[in-house]
Amino acid sequence: MVNFTVDQIRSIMDKKANIRNMSVIAHVDHGKSTLTDSLVCKAGIIASARAGETRFTDTRKDEQERCITIKSTAISLFYELSENDLAFIKQSKDGCGFLINLIDSPGHVDFSSEVTAALRVTDGALVVVDCVSGVCVQTETVLRQAIAERIRPVLMMNKMDRALLELQLEPEALYQTFQRIVENVNVIISTYGEGESGPMGNIMIDPVLGTVGFGSGLHGWAFTLKQFAEMYVAKFAAKGEGQLAPSERCKKVEDMMKKLWGDRYFDPSNGKFSKSAVNADGKKLPRTFCQLILDPIFKVFDAIMNFKKEETAKLIEKLDIKLDSEDKDKEGKQLLKSVMRRWLPAGEALLQMITIHLPSPVTAQKYRCELLYEGPPDDEAAMGVKNCDPKGPLMMYISKMVPTTDKGRFYAFGRVFSGVVSTGLKVRIMGPNFTPGKKEDLYIKPIQRTILMMGRYVEPIEDVPCGNIVGLVGVDQYLVKTGTISTFEHAHNMRVMKFSVSPVVRVAVEAKNPADLPKLVEGLKRLAKSDPMVQCIIEESGEHIIAGAGELHLEICLKDLEEDHACIPIKKSDPVVSYRETVSEESSQMCLSKSPNKHNRLFMKARPFPDGLAEDIDKGDVSARQELKTRARYLAEKYEWDVTEARKIWCFGPDGSGPNILTDVTKGVQYLNEIKDSVVAGFQWATKEGVLCEENLRGVRFDVHDVTLHADAIHRGGGQIIPTARRVLYACVLTAQPRLMEPIYLVEIQCPEQVVGGIYGVLNRKRGHVFEESQVAGTPMFVVKAYLPVNESFGFTADLRSNTGGQAFPQCVFDHWQILPGDPFDNTTRPSQVVAETRKRKGLKEGVSALDNFLDKL
């Protein structure tokens, strides 16, 4: 099976210019795992006959049954480029052998946290797009994440066999389809990228440069313009020139590639290229891409699928394809597969595209360092990362935990950015909450073993230098999900990953047999480790809650919990949605609360955020770590805040970074700074557990208007101020028309035209509304985009399929929070039911506490 040993891989690991770390990303069901197979079989790990069917990287049993990828899987490939191909590489290189660390990631939106983890440890991405359905919502989400992490994309148009056999497109129509997809992808890149002047330079994709592949993963064939340009250069050169040197040949091929795409036409009568669509005699000329590339492919398809024996034999001879004796007896689709696979092997084309156009760690870490490392940009660790220096201090990021075969232990999976990691090395293991100079979230322990990940297998290895992806044994006890591993004493953390979805659906679980409770608790701990997104919470009422990104995500998590992590039967509640609390107007009166000893008074008001500010805080455009003046200017310009107030933001909350703000608008108050910490603590408490039903607050700005304090410090300690601050904040919320917010999914549904009506019916029943409907050009498919409350999304997929005869495919992504209309204090409305249910579930007393409990008289 594997035709190279660990020692060989280890020797290449030192040639960091010849390493490529890349992930395969795409919309669900666009054929990532199938395509990955062609790469794996080229690099000699699957027998080539089974490629396209094995989906080697779907390692779990449920992945094979459901035919979807759930966890991202890593695999190392070895590929040698010929002298001729080496000439195309524009960055530094070292010999002709390349080590490609490939991560196949899931496309389903519920698992997009897995994608984030995969992106963090790679430098390049192969974006797969189904050429029939085009660029979908998930393609955009994933691509946006990749660009935010400064990862260079190359594009692969998959499923060309469908375009030819099912849709029977004409060559010109097919060219237009490709052209449109390339444009769509470039629009996304230019919207979220940093432009040509940015540190990465131009990352737009362009078939002319060879950064776009075309082909079919299922049939195992693919090409970029480079393959065809080479054929034609060889053909034209045969007419009288001898062997060319690799660099000259490279120039010729690159010139040829420019002629094979875009508005270039070919005149068969004299064999010349022209820029106009008609020749001198006024005859219409075919486009070069159609004539020189698609036409031969169409001919092969046509001859074989229509069983034209003589023509097929002629073509095979002309294309110089050598078939085995067993292949010669095949016909129809089987013969087509063998012929196309011999003529344009997918592995070759893709591996060449990857090695030539994706960056090596040496190239990539120069511009990724500032995004990855939180510390100062010139300390030892940062320099080590920037230069990818094996002699620098060890800096390694753990992006996720991978369960081992024996229950309960995990490999830590991550990438070495600087230094060398080796078995038995004593390292500093820093969790996400570690701050330099403090002891919390820091362990100093030896690494037990380092291992190589090979899809379904692991191989032990002595040590691994920087630029490589590796698994560690024995670190799992000290990290929950992610973290940084270093040998440098003053190292800061690598920056935490930003997830594009948030866990909004929760389920309560309990053991069927109460005696199994300890096992359940242990199982929940392991579950929290194994999935980057999942949150396991224990409520005050003693319930165990699991929060996930969506229905499917939770289903998989519960299955894992039951079968792998806790190994006990489990009872689960119906899924519940997390809500947020907010206010809709400014407080109707100035709120005052007195401290328990009656010596201190706080006066405050609450008001809602202007539209868009909460989202800016979520995205990190406005944050607690920003420089004061920059932030104040941003708030003043974009949201028309008063600059002096914007400079006096005390803090964000909950957790110091959430979408609520505490500002100080007082004028000349004595002792104010002494109680600042206590008020901030009260604010964090109040925003984490709101007054309506103890959910987080969102989008509320609290202003401290006035404070009267006791002159004696002993009478204004934390015990006096913190509870007072919380009471006054609650009073502010209650006087400012409090409202509930619910999470909303953006649903994208692909379906044929005739079932669009059925979709509207289902959405209307579930409080959804359609805001965009478009036809995918060149196909009979429609795309409907709608907003759907997460609360209504349970069973939505099944409902939709039954109403459309199984022809509609929905894809839900968490999009935004929206206010639930209605007053939570009016017993007839929806929000009041939600408040009552949530309070009951959390074991709080019935009914929201009255305003008098929080408000004091002067």
Swiss-Prot record:
The keyword Nucleotide-binding applies. Its main location: cytoplasm. It is found in: Cytoplasm; Nucleus. The keyword RNA-binding does not apply. GO terms for biological process: translational elongation. Catalyzes the GTP-dependent ribosomal translocation step during translation elongation. During this step, the ribosome changes from the pre-translocational (PRE) to the post-translocational (POST) state as the newly formed A-site-bound peptidyl-tRNA and P-site-bound deacylated tRNA move to the P and E sites, respectively. Catalyzes the coordinated movement of the two tRNA molecules, the mRNA and conformational changes in the ribosome. This is Elongation factor 2. It comes from Xenopus laevis. The gene is eef2.1.L.
